Amino acid sequence: MAATCSLLASFLLCFALLSAVSFAADPFVSYDFRVSYLTASPLGVPQQVIAVNGQFPGPLLNATTNYNVVVNVFNHLDEPLLLTWPGIQMRRNSWQDGVLGTNCPIPPRWNFTYQFQVKDQIGSFFYSPSLNFQRASGGFGPIVINNRDIIPIPFPQPDGELIFIIGDWYTQDHKALRRALDSGKELGMPDGVLINGKGPYKYNSSVPDGIDYLTFHVEPGKTYRIRVHNVGISTSLNFRIQNHSLLLVETEGHYTSQANFTDFDVHVGQSYSFLVTMDQDATSDYYIVASARFVNETVWQRVTGVAILHYSNSKGPVSGPLPVPKTDVSSPWSAMSQPKTIRQNTSASGARPNPQGSFHYGQINITNTYILRSLPPTIINGALRATLNGISFVNPSTPVRLADRNKVKGAYKLDFPDRPFNRPLRLDRSMINATYKGFIQVVFQNNDTKIQSFHVDGYSFFVVGMDFGIWSEDKKGSYNNWDAISRSTIEVYPGGWTAVLISLDNVGVWNIRVENLDRWYLGEETYMRITNPEEDGKTEMDPPDNVLYCGALKNLQKEQHHSAATSILNGHLKLMLLMVLLASVFRFC
């Protein structure tokens, strides 16, 4: 009996220790996100916004390199919901990406738990809804991934941090805006710009009385890290703080060569970090401004967000006109001067100890080139649609990898053209069949009339070139093959192109889309399907235990009667029960 007990106890102890090691390898952070409607008046007009945990914008998701993140999302809306995490690479785990090509929507009154690791990442990002134009009503919030203690940041530790979530805003909610697009109308000029969910300070008589604005309190002489995210619908915004320099240090997970700017253009879907030193006198407060860019700024004057920077020893309120952007965009060529100065800090360590410049991307042979051309929206099959390479994407009813795993035929096509052709525009479920371990060049050619931001899920890419005109092979001679910035969202100017290089080392299905919400809603997107023909469980995770089913697989979905548990949380519970059982065995023996 004693020998049996000893053997059983030894087995259970070994199993428990192995389980503990597997769970303790990297820490966990857990969040509950309750997504619901909230009545607010950010521009003085009562309207329905989308809040997370009663907050608009939503709460900060704060993690550190390699942490496991668990986000339990409760959908209290009256329509399906998905949250996506632009820039978070979801290594081997496109099941958590939160777009229709990878996930079934969370039905109303249901919840779903996202579970992912921020593997080898640092930096500034945000989360937002990906369905039904919901981002136009909110549901967004910031993400910060901190360096591990053993990896130094390439600048002195700031005295504090400030987060700015900026974006254009309409006083109509997302459903009304969606109906306008569905009826074939363009949205027109926004009603304003919000800074952290608040309207503009009354800097002149054009701003209505009674609008709630933000004041940021700072200490003189201190240096703050300023994280700026443009979560808006379609408007590029110029960000500036009156009389203060912006020292650019990071964008979307990579440290930049440090450069000072008086003002900075932040395009839709982009995130940046700056260091700002409070080195001005305190005779008065200072304006913080986010204003529409690359438009007729006189006509678009109302599309301006204004907050206040308040020194603790300030002697009075700010007054007078707003500071104007000093960065010249009067000609197309000058408009590109700022983004071309954004380069990688090749000597800094990012998420790993090795310098960011140790990956010599400029010496790798390109295996495939994809030229993705956008056009102005047009009518296809009686509806207003937007296209890439003449195809307006229609999301499959069954997510791609679920269809693959369950042998669903005809869910999508792998025939997306690698360049634009002179063919009739069409609706289709056409996707890129990309090669695992390939090294591809993607050229975004913007033949639309507006500046656009393009994003690739699951990856960062090297921004090697941009120019006006039509891209051709000889343009590669002008590429930056040494210190191009690596990021996940890049602007493309109307009548111009931007070229990026991507190393395809992340198996899964990954969305390529325009971040301008109106164009995205109208179909300007596609997906890359990347599979490993020698898959052995090491390059792609299995579907999570709580996967949702829809489309051709909807009969597999069970009714949800309680909180959707995650495998991690279940694992912790099982480990706890195992330890209790082990204690009982020792006591019995």
Curated annotation (Swiss-Prot):
Positions of the pro-segment in this chain: 564-589
Region entry Disordered, spans: 322-356
Protein name per its UniProtKB record: Monocopper oxidase-like protein SKS1
Protein keywords: Cell membrane, Copper, Glycoprotein, GPI-anchor, Lipoprotein, Membrane, Metal-binding, Signal
GO molecular function annotations of the record: copper ion binding; oxidoreductase activity
Binding site for Cu cation: 455
Membrane topology term: Lipid-anchor; GPI-anchor
Top-level lineage group: Eukaryota
Lipidation (GPI-anchor amidated serine): 563
Glycosylation positions in this chain: 62, 111, 204, 243, 260, 296, 345, 365, 433, 447
Family the UniProt entry places it in: Belongs to the multicopper oxidase family.
Organism annotation: Arabidopsis thaliana
Taxonomic lineage: Eukaryota, Viridiplantae, Streptophyta, Embryophyta, Tracheophyta
Protein localization: Cell membrane
Requisite cofactors: Cu cation
Extent of the signal sequence: 1-24
